[in-house]
Regions:
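Short, solvent-exposed loop/beta-turn-alpha elements that line the ligand-binding surface or hinge
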Residues: 27-38, 81-82, 124-143, 190-193, ...
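Hinge/lid segment of periplasmic solute-binding proteins
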Residues: 9-63, 87-92, 98, 117, ...
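Conserved N-terminal structural module of periplasmic/extracytoplasmic solute-binding proteins
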Residues: 1-21, 30-35, 78, 207-210, ...
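Glycine-centered hinge/linker elements that transmit conformational signals in sensory
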Residues: 90-95, 131-160, 189, 203
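Paired acidic/hydrophobic, glycine-rich loop segments that form the ligand-binding mouth/hinge
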Residues: 5-8, 176-181, 199
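C-terminal lobe and pocket-closing loops
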Residues: 184-194, 207-310
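Extracytoplasmic/periplasmic solute-binding protein
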Residues: 51-57, 62, 72, 87-133, ...
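Short helix-initiation/N-cap motifs at beta->coil->alpha
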Residues: 1, 12, 84-88, 158-171
Length: 323
C-alpha cells in the first residue's frame, strides 16, 4: 500500500470509506483522548459502529454574521436576529434591501449548503434509515419554500457559482450578512473596509429559537499502513486529541478553530477580534459547536443538495415545488 501513516478525510465521506475498507484504517481505541471533550456532532462523523476511528481537526459550526451598521439602518440589532424565525429574518431582509440595496445574505446556487444548514438547524436530515427522505419530509418542504420566498424578495442572493458566491456576493460587498461554516471568515476579512462592522450569532429557525448547524470539516485517521501505530496514536492524542496549547497555536498561527470545548476558556479563544467589533467570536463558535444536533449522514448528501437546489431554482422560475 502507498497510503501514508495518517490521512485527513472530509467528515461527510469517512464512514463510507471505513465501512467499505475496514482493514485500511486503525481504530483509535486505547488512545489517550478525552472524547467527551469534543462537540458531539463533530465527533459523530468519525465513530463507526460505536468505535472511534478519527481525531477531529477543525470546527465547521455555522455562523450567521451580520453587518450591524446596516441592521441599525432598519432599526435592528444583533439581538433582534438571535432566535428569530426565518419569517422575521425575511422581513428584516426586505427592509435592508429597500434601504441599502444589499441582500441580507447569499448562498451558492450550485450546491445544497443552505438547504442542509437550515435542515440541520431543525434537527432533520435529507435521509432517513439510509434512504432519501424527500417527498414526505415536511420540514424540507418548508425550508425550500422559505428559500424560494427569500430569493423572490431579494433577501437571499442565489449566486450562479462558487466564484460568484465568494468573489462577487461576499467580497464584492453585495450582502449585509453571511451564513456559512465559520471557515468563511477569512473570505469576509478580505473586505478590510468593513472591519469592526460585523457580529455573529446563531441560525434562525422555522418556528423561532436559536438554530445550530455545521458545514464541512475534516478529521485525521491512522491507516493500516502505519509502521508504528502506538506512536501515531500518541501523536494524535498529544496534538489534536484535546490539547488547548495545540489549538491555541493552530488558531493563532493558522486560523484553525477547534471543537474541543475547554478551549472556549483559553485566553487565545477569548481574545476580541477587531473585524467582529472586538467580540470573542472564536469562543462563541466553540460554544455553539456543543449544540449542533446530530442528523443522519449520507455519501449522497452533496448530490441530494444539488438536486434540491435545482428544484428551488426551478420553482423561483415558475415551476411547482411539489413537482
Amino acid at each position: 500500500s502507498n497510503l501514508p501513516d495518517i490521512v485527513q478525510f472530509q467528515d461527510h465521506y469517512i464512514q463510507r470509506y471505513v465501512s467499505d475498507y475496514p482493514d485500511a484504517f486503525v481504530p483509535m481505541e486505547g488512545a489517550d483522548v478525552d472524547w467527551d471533550g469534543f462537540g458531539k456532532e463533530k465527533l459523530s462523523y468519525s465513530i463507526v459502529d460505536g468505535v472511534h476511528y478519527g481525531v477531529p481537526v477543525d470546527n465547521s459550526t455555522v455562523i450567521f454574521a451580520y453587518r450591524t451598521d446596516l441592521l441599525e439602518q432598519v432599526g435592528k440589532t444583533i439581538d433582534d436576529m438571535t432566535g428569530a424565525t426565518w419569517a422575521d429574518v425575511t422581513k428584516v431582509g426586505e427592509d435592508v434591501y429597500a434601504k441599502t440595496g444589499k441582500y441580507l445574505f447569499s448562498c451558492s446556487g450550485d450546491n445544497g449548503d443552505l438547504i442542509y444548514i437550515m435542515m440541520q438547524a431543525e434537527g432533520v436530515a435529507e435521509f432517513k434509515d439510509g434512504e432519501p427522505y424527500i417527498t414526505e419530509n415536511e420540514t424540507m418542504h418548508r425550508v425550500c419554500e422559505t428559500i424560494v420566498d427569500m430569493a423572490k424578495k431579494n433577501v437571499c442572493y442565489l449566486a450562479n457559482s462558487w466564484s460568484d458566491y465568494i468573489d462577487q456576493s461576499i467580497q464584492g460587498d453585495m450582502v449585509a450578512g453571511v451564513v456559512q461554516g465559520n471557515w468563511i471568515i477569512p473570505t469576509m476579512e478580505a473586505v478590510t473596509e468593513n472591519s469592526g462592522k460585523w457580529q455573529i450569532t446563531t441560525i434562525p429557525t422555522l418556528d423561532g429559537g436559536e438554530g445550530y448547524a455545521s458545514n464541512g470539516g475534516s478529521s485525521l485517521y491512522i491507516t493500516a499502513n502505519c509502521g508504528n501505530v502506538d506512536l501515531a496514536k500518541s501523536f494524535l492524542a498529544y496534538t489534536f486529541g484535546g490539547s488547548t496549547q495545540t489549538y491555541d497555536n493552530a488558531l493563532r498561527d493558522g486560523g484553525v478553530v477547534t471543537t474541543v470545548l475547554k478551549c472556549a476558556d483559553s485566553d487565545v479563544y477569548n481574545e476580541g477580534i477587531e473585524f467582529f467589533n472586538n467580540e470573542p467570536v472564536y469562543k462563541q463558535i466553540v460554544e455553539m459547536s456543543e449544540n449542533v444536533p446530530i442528523i443522519e449522514q449520507s455519501d449522497y448528501h452533496v448530490r441530494a443538495g444539488v438536486y434540491l437546489t435545482t428544484a428551488v431554482i426551478n420553482t423561483i422560475n415558475g415551476s411547482n415545488l411539489d413537482d
